[in-house]
């Protein structure tokens, strides 16, 4: 009441009224702006004048018991007057200082865990190195980049479920934690955050940073991995750049990088197999990157790269609607065209069948090192505006655009025959034939293209056929610009189809991607890539093929053993033996195979001549198409370590060494696994042909006719004698027993008798 009375008195004075009405604050709109709603309209100002007051903070009454009235300097820390309109106490900012110095200490153990992404960022910056600043024009192009280093790749929905489960486990609501990564993260975080005193909302925000990829469409001139983007404001301005080397790597960048390498290797390998699509899927499903299944990564990771997109398309995932040609991503920004087959003649009078795009179209072209805007009509380039890092990159973009334009003068510039093939030795399609031809040498193309005088336009210059800049003349329709062309910003994905040869088409039938577009660049992956598929064994060279083949046989020995005796042809045709064939000298592949198959047939025919170690050792050689020959071998050659190495038919060698005591096999000195069963199963190698139910009488006896196989043996009557072929082509004389009771003793005596009979 006191206050109101005072105000009334003030208002009765004319001066007060004048000040209030003449100054501009009486605009109703302004008053409304600053007084309506709970949202603070000028936080900085508000903070300034609040902090200028003696007691700007309010606190719970209990604070009086916990903080003295004055600090060591005798300054008052809290006021005895209550806060108007609440039962809280007015407190001075000095109280905060006192509390920080003398207040109760709480455990800090959870802070680095909750604020993990911040702590890691500090470490990266501490160990990073900033180089000199260079002043130059920055060709920045907007790209979709990852702005959040150190995250897992969960979808927003998956992350939400994990966060609810970790932070608010008792809240109601259905949560589905299905993927492996969700379960692992939930378990890990629950353990880490036990008894955590940090506000749950804060924890939830921080978890979101850790789990979800956040992308922004930003102008970038240099590296695009997240550890560079987090310092974008420090490394590039409008006219300057500062060199920077990150002080650490983060898993999400490593995953992106390794995924691209794995996908490229898989697409390249699939291209040369009999059924590329089936092979590609088999490899994607059996590959792990940094211990996580590649198919799981593909489902979550937004990386757009040609090989990665081919793998996604094969899995039935949607991909970007832009298409790829010559390593550039093309996005049509306006116009339309229809496709017609046309036959054209090259400068060498070779006929090419090309699909001509009829109609006016505009495209953006974005590559790693150059970007461009292309306007074209039917088989005519109207305008190409290029920008790039250097002369070489600009030239690459110009060649791709000229070929893409399908102009007559480009086709006539071909010298010599076009016969480029892909990895599977199949001819490339005509457009890629042309592209390869000019990528090798574009001199004639540039010379024949034609030049024109140019107008002086800001930010644009001409480029001559020898790729030097000029302000007077330029290649017809081509200009070089200082400004880059932004990447296509939309994240829209479309349904695509993929054919057997890995050509990806949109629903209109336009080819978006094909294996020809997959880069040949080789890199070293940051995370371990484990290719379980036999098709990828050769990626690490011949030794890896050898070790992997034998490891595979040992791991699958139970099923291999049954197939070996019941359905050998099916076993020989297994794709796991395919890579091995490249190690066997071409000239002897068929002979080796015929020899080993005959040997195996003898083992099958003569009961008990089954020798596990020898079957494992020789099995891969039987996979080649066999040649019938009388050749006998005591060793087989494989090409590893740059020369032929021998595998002995009997006994150990550096290539294949079986240790009877430990029952372990080493191949080229590398452990290839253990045999779970005893290879000596009552036999002592091939010579111990244990013929149950037969008595071994001695050496071959010609009077009893030619040597029989095991199936013929079963027709003998009791007491009848015959010659039998065993093991390595040795023949012995046997007699079918008259009584069945003594069959058991055969096993023990046969071994000794065969030795005597043979020697």
Curated annotation (Swiss-Prot):
Residues making up the signal peptide according to the UniProt record: none
Location within or outside the cell: Virion; Host nucleus
Highest taxon, organism lineage: Viruses
Keyword Ribonucleoprotein attributed: no
GO cellular component, one term: virion component
Keywords tagged on the record: Cap snatching, Eukaryotic host gene expression shutoff by virus, Eukaryotic host transcription shutoff by virus, Host gene expression shutoff by virus, Host nucleus, Host-virus interaction, Inhibition of host RNA polymerase II by virus, mRNA capping, mRNA processing, Viral transcription, Virion
GO MF entries: RNA binding; RNA-directed RNA polymerase activity
Site (Avian adaptation): residue numbering on this chain: 627
UniProt cross-references to InterPro entries, sorted A to Z: Flu_PB2_2nd (IPR049110), Flu_PB2_6th (IPR049114), Flu_PB2_C (IPR049115), Flu_PB2_CAP-bd (IPR048298), Flu_PB2_middle (IPR049111), Flu_PB2_N (IPR049106), INV_PB2 (IPR001591), PB2_helical (IPR049113)
Motif Nuclear localization signal mapped to chain: 736-739
Chief location bin: virion
Gene Ontology BP annotations: 7-methylguanosine mRNA capping; cap snatching; DNA-templated transcription; symbiont-mediated suppression of host gene expression; symbiont-mediated suppression of host mRNA transcription via inhibition of RNA polymerase II activity; viral RNA genome replication
Function summary: Plays an essential role in transcription initiation and cap-stealing mechanism, in which cellular capped pre-mRNAs are used to generate primers for viral transcription. Recognizes and binds the 7-methylguanosine-containing cap of the target pre-RNA which is subsequently cleaved after 10-13 nucleotides by the viral protein PA. Plays a role in the initiation of the viral genome replication and modulates the activity of the ribonucleoprotein (RNP) complex.
Protein family: Belongs to the influenza viruses PB2 family.
Subunit relationships: Influenza RNA polymerase is composed of three subunits: PB1, PB2 and PA. Interacts (via N-terminus) with PB1 (via C-terminus). Interacts with nucleoprotein NP (via N-terminus).
Full protein name: Polymerase basic protein 2
Species name: Influenza A virus (strain A/Chicken/Hong Kong/96.1/2002 H5N1 genotype Y)
